[in-house]
Design a protein with these regions (language model features):
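Compositionally biased, intrinsically disordered or flexible polar/acidic segments
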Residues: 27-195
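Bacterial N-terminal signal peptides
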Residues: 11-25
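N-terminal secretory signal peptides that target proteins for export/translocation
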Residues: 1-10
Length: 195
């Protein structure tokens, strides 16, 4: 077996070490939509994983909880509207950004039971009534068909949380999204370990 030793200028050695550390970091997989390597689950000190879907930087909410950005989504675009006032929540900052048009989310987590909380809000000003933001999603085999976000949230600029108990047996939490009328959209995901 041969050992390869790269020859790099001293200024790059630190960057290489940081890059190597980043590549094994559980916080963000290498590319959007790619499942992280085996054994790279990110679990906060509390055990809860908090993912902010529409931002590329971490967010600390009004309760002091830290939400980390994710590259666990396949497809989609982001929008941040920091000036919005969001009702029905104590953590409005979590709902001011969104990921929309995504098709899939896959996150490597340890096997076990979890409560998956999907955080939604209608923040796009062109959506002003029912049937304008309708999509379906599937969380580990549990299907939510014809999910009308405007109706579920009770209108625009209102937070809505869908909580789904799941049992992970293959090391991956998978959520599939299908557009029906408008784009699927999501603000954040919480993955809470259960006994």
């Amino acid at each position: 077996m041969k050992t390869l030793s790269p020859i790099l200028p001293p200024s790059l050695h630190t960057g290489l070490v940081a890059l190597l550390l980043l590549s094994v970091s559980p916080a963000i997989p290498a590319s959007r939509g790619a499942a992280p390597a085996a054994g790279t689950a990110l679990v906060a000190a509390s055990g809860t994983i908090r993912i902010i879907a529409g931002l590329s930087a971490p967010l600390t909410d009004e309760k002091g909880e830290k939400w980390l950005p994710s590259r666990d989504f396949l497809d989609g675009d982001t929008m941040d509207r920091p000036e919005l006032s969001i009702a029905n929540t104590e953590i409005p900052s979590v709902y001011r950004s969104e990921l929309f048009g995504m098709t899939r989310f896959v996150r490597r987590i340890p096997n076990g039971n979890y409560l998956v909380k999907l955080h939604f809000a209608v923040t796009y000003e062109a959506i002003d009534g029912p049937r304008q933001c309708v999509f379906s999603f599937d969380v580990e085999g549990r299907s939510f068909k014809d999910f009308d976000l405007f109706v579920r949230a009770g209108g625009a600029l209102k937070a809505y949380v869908e909580s789904i108990p799941v049992a992970i047996r293959d090391g991956d939490l998978e959520i599939k999204f299908t557009a029906l009328s408008g784009n699927p959209t999501i603000s954040a995901i919480e993955i809470v370990p259960q006994p």
